[in-house]
């Protein structure tokens, strides 16, 4: 069976996902077959594996860092919020249905067999399993039925590294308080604490680190700097949405829907030096972009209502009539159509039908069975501004409840309005390049002036930079002693 180590955090966004990815990369570089694991993830950002299973993006990133194919066993339970008090529950990559939060809490321990089967299966195939916890391990009201933090650590006998975020302040209280609130049994599982997102001279920290070690009774296993690596990370959502780049040659506006999902679809455009990618949630902030993107969403009808009430729908329709390129992905694609029906209340929005934006001749009906599949092929039949996509390859995945009449192929177009069910459609560099070339031609600017790069090599380099930072920040001899159960 595999060796294991678990990364828990003092709170959400402490940096667990990124550090777990970095540790996966370090172990891979050191010759280990390593796999990530998170028993339960709550996220709207998801991915479809080759066998059609759905899993959280964080474990996909960690698998990529480890150099292996993403596998639903790495995230056996995925919760996708549908409302403030309920989620769609996905077990081993397949939808089990929608469930109120209280019902899931009561039934949580029923999912332990699925969690353990997934973990033990991975542990038989790999040398090391790097486990990520969720939120804080000392949410006292949730500890009784915990299957993702110390509850899981007990089940698989995992040693724990506890991570605190110094960038928000109060890291010593975070770490000591979290250790102090543990039961004696769980406290013994914590083998080290990590100070994450540090800016400045470590020497200034040293007196505090020594006191922290004395109070917690465990060593400081690492001080990791605030990282500037370009890696898709669920914890970066607020930072990403907060960005408002200075004007660039090409301006792309992504509508920030309240229940936006798979925001990583657009990250390829962020990597061009002279492309501005903005997230917009107010009509007055839309301005006059070169391209408007309506992203995927977990609640198409509710977010379409928000789009209408906010005034953004009218602004997008006006921009489309003026020739602006409008592109909808998945739920955004459905919104662009004429009509959406939900007779079975799949979205539980209290609405059985609603008019769409009317920019594409599309009729969508929500059904109980979810489409979840990887897809690839060659564009054909693309008209208008993006006609140069014809003959070029695409790859991605579909994940949606609705079926749309009139939808044809990977990309449906009418004039300057385009839509697709394919998440990751911009990931192929040739696709992103072709779209940007079309926008440059329309605007009479040089595509070369945007700055180009090798996307795959760039991603691998980012994982290596992350590994460099983790290797330098962690006490790696201590980490290996923890893995070997010598601590």
Q: Over which residues does each language-model region extend?
A:
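A conserved active-site-flanking secondary-structure segment within enzyme catalytic domains
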Residues: 337-391
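Catalytic nucleophile serine of serine hydrolases
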Residues: 330
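Short active-site segment of divalent metal-dependent hydrolases/proteases
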Residues: 333-334, 426
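Flexible phosphate-sensing "switch/lid" loops adjacent to ATP/NTP-binding sites
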Residues: 1-320, 325, 342-345, 368-369, ...
